[in-house]
Amino acid sequence: MNFIRKKTVLLLTLGALALQASAQPGGRFVQVKSPVVNTDNTVTFNYQNDKAKEVLVDVQFAGRKAMTKGEHGVWTVTLGPAAPDMYPYCFIVDGTTIMDPQNPDWFPNEGFKNSIVDIRGDKELIHAVKNVPHGSVDYLTYYSKTFGLYGNVIVYTPPFYDQNPEKKYPVFYLISGTTDTEEVYFKVGRANFILDNLIAEGAAKEMIIVMPYGNPAKYFPAGTNVWEKGDIFSKDFINDLMPFVESNYRTINDRDHRAIGGFSRGGNQGLALGLTNLDKFSYLCSYSSFTSMELPGVYDNVDSLNNQIHLFWLGVGTDDFLYGNAKDYMDFLDKKGIKNVKEFTNDKFGHTWMNAKYFLDKSARLLFNE
């Protein structure tokens, strides 16, 4: 097993201290810090480039705004105030999109590489780093016979996992969305801190969280027709990923101690895998997901489903572009008589990681309580 173990409190602390000195003509150095979260929850963005003709910032809470060039070629703008949370943003420099070079906190994604600003406010958020025991996060590589290649996965172990070598734990397989990498539920969704806080409060069971990459096509060389290989994500998940996790971590290997779910595409993947493998999973979670009613034979025996599924949890925001599909799926389950738990949010951000974090916090409290 190859892994890099990260102590997440140190990781976040180092990110908050980022500061860079930039050289100027004549040997002068100017310290530029960005972003700066002000006491009124406004945010000042700074970017140094004396040669740029136009610089914009594009941030989730304010949209795209022009920045003003000041002394020493530092472009700046102050936006907000914004509600406390984590927001992705980027700079657009003469038409080219870049991350903030002063900020080490970034959003891992196939299609874009945004930076992240964390507005904390007076009240601690569900993902806040609190003075509680913290778990560990492992970056791992495993060999997939299905792919004929190596895959990536991130694993969270709860506080005191290493200090209790005889103790075994339930497992929650948590899948990120379309274009997201395996890192997103750690770096943006802050699954580790959410679970640390819930466990410390006694609001959730101790559990291992496994965060795989949901898009196996990215493992293959360009031009490979991955789709002709069939549903290789599910095949790898069942035949390669799960055995790897269970041989390297102290997991309780039965359906009553396995949960599966995810955000967006990951929620649909999780439901499809869970519903077609109820011999392996009994807790199912879908966060802001496109959900399918086209699973042959799955929904036919309602009594069997209700007896086998300990928790069928569905969450979506009313402003999410997938709200219509998610609501139709909920109505479909209700008409069938399939028991489920629903959670709705009312917000202006729609299909975002604000909701993904909130849904994880709500559903994790209900896992492994049977």
Task: Locate each region found by the language model.
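Bacterial Sec-dependent N-terminal signal peptides
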Residues: 1-27
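Non-catalytic cap/lid and distal C-terminal segments of serine-dependent acyl enzymes
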Residues: 24-26, 31, 37-64, 69-370
